[in-house]
């Protein structure tokens, strides 16, 4: 072996060379990962927003469990498409595919409005309170339910040309244009926080659906709260508990939805309480208890708003 080769070998084995190599490799890896994060971050945020909006519209029954638009026609839910010309949902005349990101964004822009309410059920727009909806909802999610004022919620406007361009302030002044309400639901499952939505008809009592966009429950057990087969039983349930005679005192009755252990029919039969109960998930009792508590705690502060919508619906029916 030549002297030059020996010197080169010694150089490679020197500590400073090894340290320099490791530092250089670490720097390269750090720059590479930072670049990848910078490039992918907007895409990830867009995907998260798309999923959250889908879950919201699923809870409001605007989307079916296959992610397709649907519309109520003669008291039946039928497939629908978002007509680019009329900017409205129309009964589908051919096979409907899953909603795309642009379609969902366009529908949300036209017919979904974030609003605020207080303990008296008065409704405000975010513009009136000079608040940013995105920042406010993020902050609200991090707080215990009902610990923040004012309270946020969403509304789905009626599928008409009259409502598509209404601002939040316009809607707050004319709640008769509201088709459905969507409430943020937060609580704790077995393994951590759970966050989702509950959709309610404009009668302030009848459930349209539920969806969870964040949960870390056990796959095959507690995670089944995101299973369509479990979620579909929420449709038509009542969030205000009826008494034994079948009447509802909205001001004093219990408010929420109870996930029972076992089946509703076996546990409650045909009693009025069954209208506000959901079948439990086998092997996921603690998750189900957390879900029940999430509905009770999250909805409690919206009681007066729900009562106001119930009264509004009654007035509309009386005036017809």
Curated annotation (Swiss-Prot):
Primary subcellular site in the record, as a coarse category: membrane
Transmembrane segment boundaries: 16-36
UniProt GO molecular function: FMN binding; oxidoreductase activity, acting on NAD(P)H, quinone or similar compound as acceptor
E.C. code: 7.2.1.1
One Pfam family named in its UniProt record: FMN_bind
Top-rank EC class of the record's enzyme: translocase
Keywords noted in UniProt: Cell inner membrane, Cell membrane, Flavoprotein, FMN, Ion transport, Membrane, NAD, Phosphoprotein, Sodium, Sodium transport, Translocase, Transmembrane, Transmembrane helix, Transport, Ubiquinone
Localization annotation: Cell inner membrane
Catalytic activity: a ubiquinone + n Na(+)(in) + NADH + H(+) = a ubiquinol + n Na(+)(out) + NAD(+)
Needed co-factor(s): FMN
Membrane topology: Single-pass membrane protein
Protein's GO biological process: sodium ion transport
GO cellular component: plasma membrane
Residues with PTM FMN phosphoryl threonine: 285
Subunit structure: Composed of six subunits; NqrA, NqrB, NqrC, NqrD, NqrE and NqrF.
Physiological role: NQR complex catalyzes the reduction of ubiquinone-1 to ubiquinol by two successive reactions, coupled with the transport of Na(+) ions from the cytoplasm to the periplasm. NqrA to NqrE are probably involved in the second step, the conversion of ubisemiquinone to ubiquinol.
Stated name of the protein: Na(+)-translocating NADH-quinone reductase subunit C
Organism: Chlamydia pneumoniae
Taxon lineage: Bacteria, Pseudomonadati, Chlamydiota, Chlamydiia, Chlamydiales
Gene behind the chain: nqrC
